[in-house]
Amino acid sequence: MGRRRQVSDQQISIAAREVFLDRGPKAPVAMVAKKLGVSTATLFQRTGSKQQLMLMALQPEVTAITELDRGIQLDVPVREQLARILVELNDYLGMLIGGSITLRAAQIEAELPDPTPSKCRALLADWLTAASAAMLLRVADAITTADVLIGTLESRHIHAYMQQVQLSSKQHRDYIRAMLDVVFPAFG
């Protein structure tokens, strides 16, 4: 019978993500091990290499389209639906952007996970088209609107990363609601 794991893969991912996003790709694995209360050897035994640890930690584990997959919900206000969709996309894009920048700085090539930002844009455009067809929302150009909404979220994450600023979930939610009021003034 093998020894019980001291820490889960999820705990390793979270700790490594925090260390590498905060300290950059040159942060030693020993910092992650210390944060977890395990030895560096234990981490290498579990992940194989620093590169594998970084890949494990810096690629999103969740999908960005759970809310989009629900489709249009006639019993939920459209502003609420769109806000939930954008909060979910924002969380996903934040992980993807921070992770991608850090992996690139470490010269680690990694494929973008599915859904890619382009696919997220296309799915959001489809949702906006459906909301417009159901007369829940006025959208002149769903593709451009999706690009504006997602592009704004991406740029906010890039700016926060470059300024080394951590934004809270509440700050993101408040920003998304304010952005919706600007893009769709009829909501306000």
What is the meaning of each model-derived region?
Residues 1-35, 41, 51-55, 67:
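Basic, helix-initiating cap at the start of DNA-binding domains
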